[in-house]
Amino acid sequence: MTEADIAVKSSPRDYKKLTRLYCMNGGFHLQILADGTVAGAADENTYSILRIKATSPGVVVIEGSETGLYLSMNEHGKLYASSLVTDESYFLEKMEENHYNTYQSQKYGENWYVGIKKNGKMKRGPRTHIGQKAIFFLPRQVEQEED
């Protein structure tokens, strides 16, 4: 194996592993609650544990591990949790230059991103754009106990 081989090979994320999405804006974790609400959590909790599943290259669905509900964005840009994966549940995952990830609605558009405001409430898709701290998330792997 040469140095060039090492430089271009990256280890793919294990999508069976559990993750928290830590927002650059205010330090909140994305959480999916049992009632279908999506919000930011200041502290780590069971509702902020997520499973990010790739459906095709660069496209993911985000499932709340505790609730089994899927993150979705409606036609008004409001984030909600759905019991079924619909066309509103697919997000384009991209690692940005700052090494944070963004999650852009595949259905609704060029500049509709998942985002958390400074107060922990979710930001509507049409009010987001690249460069805002609200849309940058750092995936943090959750340590799982061995069975």
From Swiss-Prot:
CDD domains: beta-trefoil_FGF1-like
Pfam families with a match to the protein in the record: FGF
SMART domains from the UniProt entry: FGF (SM00442)
GO cellular component term, pick one: cytoplasm
Positions annotated to bind heparin: N25
Localization (cell): Secreted; Cytoplasm; Cytoplasm, Cell cortex; Cytoplasm, Cytosol
Its biological purpose: Plays an important role in the regulation of cell survival, cell division, angiogenesis, cell differentiation and cell migration. Functions as a potent mitogen in vitro. Acts as a ligand for FGFR1 and integrins. Binds to FGFR1 in the presence of heparin leading to FGFR1 dimerization and activation via sequential autophosphorylation on tyrosine residues which act as docking sites for interacting proteins, leading to the activation of several signaling cascades. Binds to integrins.
GO terms classed as biological process: angiogenesis; branch elongation involved in ureteric bud branching; fibroblast growth factor receptor signaling pathway; hemopoiesis; mesonephric epithelium development; neurogenesis; positive regulation of angiogenesis; positive regulation of cell division
Lineage: Eukaryota, Metazoa, Chordata, Craniata, Vertebrata
Protein name (database record): Putative fibroblast growth factor 1
Primary residence: secreted
Family the entry assigns: Belongs to the heparin-binding growth factors family.
Entry-linked Gene3D superfamilies: 2.80.10.50
Segments of this protein annotated with the region Heparin-binding: 117-133
Keywords, ordered alphabetically: Angiogenesis, Cytoplasm, Developmental protein, Differentiation, Growth factor, Heparin-binding, Mitogen, Nucleus, Secreted
An annotated Gene Ontology molecular function: integrin binding
Transmembrane segments: none
InterPro entries: Fibroblast_GF_fam, IL1/FGF
Domain of life: Eukaryota
